[in-house]
Structure formats: structure tokens, C-alpha cells
Amino acid sequence: MAQKIVRVGDIQIGNDLPFVLFGGMNVLESRDLAMQVCEEYVRVTEKLGIPYVFKASFDKANRSSIHSFRGPGLEEGMKIFEEIKKTFKVPVITDVHEPFQAQPVAEVCDIIQLPAFLSRQTDLVVAMARTNAVINIKKAQFLAPQEMKHILTKCEEAGNDRLILCERGSSFGYNNLVVDMLGFGIMKQFEYPVFFDVTHALQMPGGRADSAGGRRAQVTDLAKAGLSQKLAGLFLEAHPDPEHAKCDGPCALRLNKLEAFLSQLKQLDELIKSFPAIETA
């Protein structure tokens, strides 16, 4: 089964290639913090030889509480992303929540992301696809892996096959998510690159009454389990002070653990991809 390769600048993304990191912070809390976080990611990924794309949101439109911090908004967010790209020479990925945002975001960002909660919204999917940007499609918590084929088809019929699928866990009762490792293989059958969002798979949605809880202590276990499935990449959020992060701090890796964390994952990825495939059907 031939696997597609998606190109973002000089980066090649594919399930059989060395893993790519989509990493950064949950939301653009400030310009200075974004620069600090990106600088550390760049230092570590350059040292380890991991292809890297900076990630952050300019607007968190699906917060639990109306009083929760959402971000700087579209205009200011794009200015920060432009500065990050110019300063660190890295591609950028961010999420789009409404059709009108797709084109202006795609003009700045190298990859635009379809949020899990919105992944069946046809108008949004089509607007994003028509930009011809690379699209990272988050699998909704309520969708089976095989149902992602319908979203891929919407994008393809809108003229875009520069697509990535991303697992982020499935609802398991109330306030909990689980990751079905068999789902990765199902999505890989569509031949597009598959990523694993380990950060949001650790969420406990609504677990803190007015915000999501999380299980940061298990991030290494879950990341290793995911990359053992021979994936194109990992989606990760980190923060220098998770206890005071403005969104999803309980899920965020401590920034000072980034190098040790990624070093182990790179070794695992290299080992897994050195094994020949075994036909067991």
C-alpha cells in the first residue's frame, strides 16, 4: 500500500519517513512567550534532527467557560506568526474555526488545522480545502477512524489532496478520552500521513468544572504508544509554567523536559521504522 507524502517547504511528511513534530503552545498567550517557546523547540529539534513546525492557536473558540482566555485574535495572531516565521525560519500551523478565516490564515500559515469538534462542518472543510494549503484534519472525539474517509473526500472534491489526519482520542463516557491504537492502522489505509496529538489525548474534558483537566504525568507513555504505530508525526504542546498556562496546562509537557522527551521518541521512531512489515491478514 503506497503511502502519500505531503510536502511543507523542505519538510517531507509521510508514515514511512522520520517523524515530524508539530509542536508549540496551546494558545498565543503573548508575543514574548510564543517567541520563548518557539526558540526552545527550534534549539531542541535542530540538535536532535527532527523536522519541526511551530504550533499555536490565535483563538480558542471552544473554551468551556465564556470567561476563559481565548487568545489575541486573527489580526494580532497573524502578526505574531509572521514574526516567528521570519525570526526562526520555521513553518507554522494554526487552527481555523470559521470559513471566513481560512484564506487570511492560509496566506500566513503553512498548515491550517481543522478542529476535531468542527471536522464534519462541510462549509468550513470546503473553505479550507479551497485555499490549497496543507490541512491537518483532527479526528473528532465522536467519530470512528473509518469515518474520516468522508472528510478526506470533501477536501479532495474541493480540489485539495494535501491532507494529514490526526488522532486526538475518543470520548469514553463523561470527562474522559481514550486512544484506540487500532485506529491508526485504519486511518493509514487511506494512504495519507497520520499524526498523533498526544497532548489533547490526555485531556479530561470539563474535568475542572469550568475548564479541561489533564494527565501530564502520562504524556511519555502515551506518546511512545502512539509512535510505535509507525506514524508520520507527533502533535505536542509544552509550556514553561503549565500550572499557570491560560489553556490546557494540565496536559502540557514542561518545556524544560522537551529535549529528554523528544530524544527518546526519536530513538523509538527510528527503531520502529527499521522493522520490515509483516503481513498478517
UniProtKB/Swiss-Prot annotation:
It is an enzyme of class 2 (transferase). It comes from the Bacteria. Pathway: Carbohydrate biosynthesis; 3-deoxy-D-manno-octulosonate biosynthesis; 3-deoxy-D-manno-octulosonate from D-ribulose 5-phosphate: step 2/3; Bacterial outer membrane biogenesis; lipopolysaccharide biosynthesis. GO terms for biological process: carbon utilization; Kdo2-lipid A biosynthetic process; keto-3-deoxy-D-manno-octulosonic acid biosynthetic process; lipopolysaccharide biosynthetic process. It catalyses: D-arabinose 5-phosphate + phosphoenolpyruvate + H2O = 3-deoxy-alpha-D-manno-2-octulosonate-8-phosphate + phosphate. It is found in: Cytoplasm. InterPro entries: Aldolase_TIM (IPR013785), DAHP1/KDSA (IPR006218), KDO8P_synthase (IPR006269). One of its GO terms (cellular component) is cytosol. One of its GO terms (molecular function) is 3-deoxy-8-phosphooctulonate synthase activity. The keyword Cytoplasm applies. Keywords: Cytoplasm, Lipopolysaccharide biosynthesis, Transferase. Belongs to the KdsA family. Coiled coil: none annotated. This is 2-dehydro-3-deoxyphosphooctonate aldolase. Its EC number is 2.5.1.55. It comes from Pseudomonas aeruginosa (strain ATCC 15692 / DSM 22644 / CIP 104116 / JCM 14847 / LMG 12228 / 1C / PRS 101 / PAO1). Pfam families: DAHP_synth_1. The keyword Transferase applies.
